[in-house]
């Protein structure tokens, strides 16, 4: 009994975009589209299709987009027992085709197909016989004609309605390995936006994930659906860096990384905030900046529910709970939870204070201290108390001042339960309990627990009497 014949076209495994829709795709989506189309063709070949097809590619020119016609014939030779086919030449040409597309993308061509490749393949026909079984052969002939729509980068304006042309009668007589899955085509119209494009690509991506990952990296064992993805991954192991900066000779493994890096030299800041007009060199920086206006803090600590604008800030905060201090001083072995703390600590060993005031040349170990110091030159006092109208140079000073109005004393001694408005007052008080006397008189060697006590004591040696009576002008050493 003759096996059934059916009509198979490349449309059964293609997604089609109009020229306008293609322009909406970003480079990552175009790369995904290319990989999917090549994988579909590879699948047709791997199922036993003898192909002789010319894949003419196209490019954008000043006269417009050049249309290309793909013609060929796909004949499928299948048997009851599928033989061992030799597709090395086809696979080689497919890889060359992929490589040429990637090269054109790197060179900045809008439509990256620029050359003509011929994919030639032939299947070696074998007669397979089991004991007592006669060979069963049949041909599933199909006409493979593509007028730009078969690799389907572009399609004329208007709706695209691609109906499934494949029909197989008596499917029960065909084995599972001999069937090609027939799925409905997607209907695309111009009024569909990016959501549709993403959805159609997502559908293809979900299919890819269901397939076996047959391209495996020997170094790491990681597997990929496509050989092109494997080659990109292998660059990591090989140390191959293809894109070099002309200014500083720094090299990058991705073209987009180089483009982003070049903005450091050019000063280009293409991303602008609509709220305040501030510009940024990277989109991610603008995204973070927007959160200053919106107040959004999407990163939340699971331990204390504190929220942060940036993931890096959350990671640093988590070390408070874990006690992790990954940054170690090579001089003294002291460890710190944040890299900035280590950098400031190193100034103790080097004596270097990297943050210098332009007005008075005074230097500081911390950038925040320099910012606070600069206000002394400008006289700016931007922080105002709502209760009494007094203004302050620093927010921390205003916070402490407010406690005079509220009576709040948040700092409590663990020994005697006495409370204080300021942390410095608590630190001085603790010396009463532990007997610590940090301040020593250079004249007599007497020590004191507080700096004020030492200052008053020194007047006994100097004879200084700064406290003067307003009535009789008599002076005293102590107030």
Swiss-Prot record:
This protein's record includes keyword DNA-binding: yes
Occurrences of domain KRAB (ranges): 8-81
Zinc finger boundaries on the chain: C2H2-type: 215-237, 243-265, 271-293, 299-321, 327-349, 355-377, 383-405, 411-433, 439-461
A Gene Ontology annotation in the biological process aspect, one of them, is: regulation of DNA-templated transcription
Cellular component GO terms, alphabetical = nucleus
Check the UniProt entry and state the signal peptide residues, or none.
none
Alphabetically, the GO molecular function entries are: DNA binding; zinc ion binding
InterPro entries noted in UniProt: KRAB, KRAB_dom_sf, Znf_C2H2_sf, Znf_C2H2_type
What UniProt keywords are attached to this protein's entry?
DNA-binding, Metal-binding, Nucleus, Repeat, Transcription, Transcription regulation, Zinc, Zinc-finger
Known PROSITE patterns for this protein?
KRAB, ZINC_FINGER_C2H2_1, ZINC_FINGER_C2H2_2
Q: Chief subcellular site?
A: nucleus
The answer, when asked if Electron transport is one of the entry's keywords, is: no
Q: According to its UniProt record, where is this protein located? A: Nucleus
Q: Which family does it belong to?
A: Belongs to the krueppel C2H2-type zinc-finger protein family.
Q: What does this protein do?
A: May be involved in transcriptional regulation.
Designated name of the protein: Zinc finger protein 525
């Amino acid at each position: 009994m003759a096996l059934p014949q059916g009509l198979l076209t490349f449309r059964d495994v293609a997604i089609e975009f109009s020229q306008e829709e293609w322009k909406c795709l970003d480079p990552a989506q175009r790369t995904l589209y290319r990989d999917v189309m090549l994988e579909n063709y590879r699948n047709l070949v791997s199922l036993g299709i003898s192909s002789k097809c010319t894949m003419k590619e196209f490019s954008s020119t000043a006269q417009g987009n050049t249309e290309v016609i793909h013609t060929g014939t796909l004949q499928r030779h299948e048997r009851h027992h599928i033989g061992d086919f030799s597709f090395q030449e086809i696979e080689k040409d497919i890889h060359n085709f992929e490589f040429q597309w990637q090269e054109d993308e790197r060179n900045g061509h809008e439509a990256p197909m620029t050359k003509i490749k011929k994919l030639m393949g032939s299947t070696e026909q074998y007669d397979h016989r089991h004991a007592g079984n006669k060979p069963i052969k049949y041909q599933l002939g199909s006409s493979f004609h593509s007028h730009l729509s078969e690799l389907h980068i572009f399609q004329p304006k208007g709706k695209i309605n691609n109906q499934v042309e494949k029909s197989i009668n008596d499917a029960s007589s065909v084995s599972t390995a001999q069937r090609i899955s027939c799925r409905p085509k997607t209907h695309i119209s111009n009024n569909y936006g990016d959501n549709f494009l993403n959805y159609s690509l997502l559908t293809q991506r979900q299919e890819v994930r269901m397939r076996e990952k047959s391209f495996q990296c020997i170094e790491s064992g990681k597997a990929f659906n496509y050989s092109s993805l494997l080659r990109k991954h292998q660059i990591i192991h090989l140390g191959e860096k293809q894109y070099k900066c002309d200014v500083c000779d720094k090299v990058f493994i991705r073209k987009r990384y180089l483009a982003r890096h070049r903005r450091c030299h050019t000063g280009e800041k293409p991303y602008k905030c609509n709220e305040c007009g501030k510009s940024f060199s990277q989109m991610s920086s603008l995204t973070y900046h927007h959160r200053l206006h919106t107040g959004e803090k999407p990163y939340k600590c699971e331990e204390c529910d504190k929220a942060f604008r940036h993931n890096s800030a959350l990671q640093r905060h988590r070390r408070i709970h874990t006690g992790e201090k990954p940054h170690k001083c090579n001089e003294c072995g002291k460890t710190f939870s944040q890299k900035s703390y280590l950098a400031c600590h190193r100034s103790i060993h080097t004596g270097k204070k990297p943050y210098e005031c332009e007005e008075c040349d005074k230097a500081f170990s911390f950038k925040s201290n320099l910012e606070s110091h600069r206000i002394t030159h400008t006289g700016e006092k931007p922080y105002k108390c709502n209760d009494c109208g007094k203004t302050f140079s620093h927010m921390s000073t205003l916070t402490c001042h407010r406690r005079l109005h509220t009576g709040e004393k948040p700092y409590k001694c663990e020994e005697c339960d006495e409370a204080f408005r300021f942390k410095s007052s608590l630190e001085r008080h603790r010396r009463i309990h532990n007997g610590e006397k940090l301040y020593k008189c250079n004249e007599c060697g007497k020590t004191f627990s507080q700096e004020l006590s030492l200052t008053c004591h020194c007047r006994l040696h100097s004879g200084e009497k700064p406290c003067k009576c307003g009535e009789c002008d008599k002076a005293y050493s102590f107030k």
